[in-house]
UniProtKB/Swiss-Prot annotation:
Recorded topology in the membrane: Multi-pass membrane protein
Lineage of the species this protein comes from: Bacteria, Pseudomonadati, Pseudomonadota, Gammaproteobacteria, Enterobacterales
TM annotation in the entry: 21-43, 63-82, 95-114, 119-141, 153-175, 195-212, 244-266, 281-303, 310-329
Locations listed in the record: Cell inner membrane
SUPFAM superfamilies the record matches: ABC transporter involved in vitamin B12 uptake, BtuC
Family note: Belongs to the binding-protein-dependent transport system permease family. FecCD subfamily.
Gene name of the record: btuC
Source organism of this protein record: Photorhabdus laumondii subsp. laumondii (strain DSM 15139 / CIP 105565 / TT01) (Photorhabdus luminescens subsp. laumondii)
GO-annotated molecular function: vitamin transmembrane transporter activity
Gene Ontology annotations of biological process type: cobalamin transport
Name of the protein described by the UniProt record: Vitamin B12 import system permease protein BtuC
UniProt-listed HAMAP family: BtuC (MF_01004)
InterPro entries: ABC_BtuC-like (IPR037294), ABC_transptr_BtuC (IPR023691), ABC_transptr_permease_BtuC (IPR000522)
Origin superkingdom: Bacteria
Subunit-structure text: The complex is composed of two ATP-binding proteins (BtuD), two transmembrane proteins (BtuC) and a solute-binding protein (BtuF).
Cellular-component GO terms for this entry: plasma membrane
Length: 335
């Protein structure tokens, strides 16, 4: 009886810790969101947001960009957390399935085909179709070959390598103007995002909300295939559904900002180190942390240089690569 009471007390204490942590993350998110609207080459404080200058810089330029950054950051972070549970691999991240490079191949092809003047809506649709094509191929392998998580992971890596090689070949044979545009896009950037691109943001948020509410299923999947099946989870159904959702999230994110690495790997690990182990609270925390984490990276990319902007993919890679190496050394058995 006493042991049961102790367990209940521990569960209650953990829930309080998780809710306090989510409250702190919410405050941090709102603070960074506020700073992102103010910051830029010209700082504009809230008392001038509705002036003529504020109408242009805050509401027409910065606000749609901030929304896109939040959507992409939340998407990649949630996708990373889902993949780490799905593949039972602590080093899994959105690019690992090859979905990012699959989307990139179509975008690179369209840029070359239209000599660098392809409309954004066409590039966006192409990125989504490329991501979904790779995802459907993975689903076909999974359905017909009944691949386990480890083998499906290796198939995704193979697709990523093949897609990356194909992109390199296309860039190599492009003209100098196309090459400059392609290389900048492949490094990740939110430059040029405005209200015309918000249909992609609107498409991302329902997926983010749905995935962030699947913590119970992911808790079961993280126990392993055998135990999840014993608990009544249909591995085939849920694994394929999650792979499809992750592919859609990553495809839309690539359409908005190009390839952005490491954020889907690093942030879920940091949250786990802070004591968030239950996916029912980890996933909402990933939404908040991914949003303000990529906003911070975007602030660095905008403010690091005068009259220039560092690609955000360079910022995330610079900050994330040392953490990835540390995780690689820390996780000794992840096969």
């Amino acid at each position: 009886m006493q042991s049961t009471h102790s367990i209940a007390e521990l569960v209650t204490r953990q829930k309080r810790h998780d809710y306090r942590f989510l409250a702190i993350l919410t405050c941090l998110f709102l603070l960074v969101f506020f700073l992102s609207l103010c910051a830029g080459e010209n700082w504009i404080w809230p008392n001038k947001w509705f002036s003529e200058t504020g109408q242009l810089f805050v509401w027409q330029l910065r606000f749609p960009r901030v929304l896109a950054v939040v959507a992409v950051g939340a998407s990649l972070t949630v996708a990373g957390a889902v993949m780490q549970a799905l593949f039972e691999n602590p080093l899994a991240e959105p690019g690992l399935l090859g979905v990012s490079n699959g989307a990139g191949v179509v975008v690179v092809f369209l840029v070359l085909m239209f000599h660098g003047i392809a409309p954004f809506w066409l590039l966006s649709i192409g990125a989504v179709l490329g991501a979904l094509t790779v995802t459907m191929i993975l689903l076909t392998f999974s359905r017909n070959r009944y691949l386990n998580n480890a083998r499906l992971l290796l198939v995704g890596v193979a697709f990523g390598v093949a897609s990356g090689a194909l992109m390199t070949w296309m860039v190599y044979f492009s003209t100098s103007l196309d090459l400059r545009q392609l290389m900048y896009w492949m490094m990740g950037s939110f430059s040029g995002i405005d209200w015309r691109h918000q249909w992609l943001v609107v498409a991302l948020f329902p997926l983010i909300i749905w995935l962030s509410r699947q913590g119970k299923v992911l808790n079961f999947l993280s126990l392993g295939e055998t135990q999840a099946q014993q608990l009544g989870i249909s591995l085939y159904y849920w694994r394929n559904l999650f792979v499809f959702a992750v592919g859609l999230l990553v495809g839309l994110s690539v359409a908005l900002a190009g390839t952005i690495s490491f954020i889907g790997l690093v942030i879920p690990h940091i949250l786990r180190l802070c004591g968030l182990t239950d996916y029912k609270t980890l996933l909402p925390a990933c939404v908040l942390s991914g949003g303000y984490g990529l906003l911070l990276a975007d602030l660095l990319s905008r403010l690091s240089l005068n009259n220039a902007e560092v690609p955000i993919g360079v910022v995330t890679a610079t900050l994330g690569a040392p953490v990835f190496i540390w995780l690689l050394l820390r996780v000794r058995d992840w096969s």
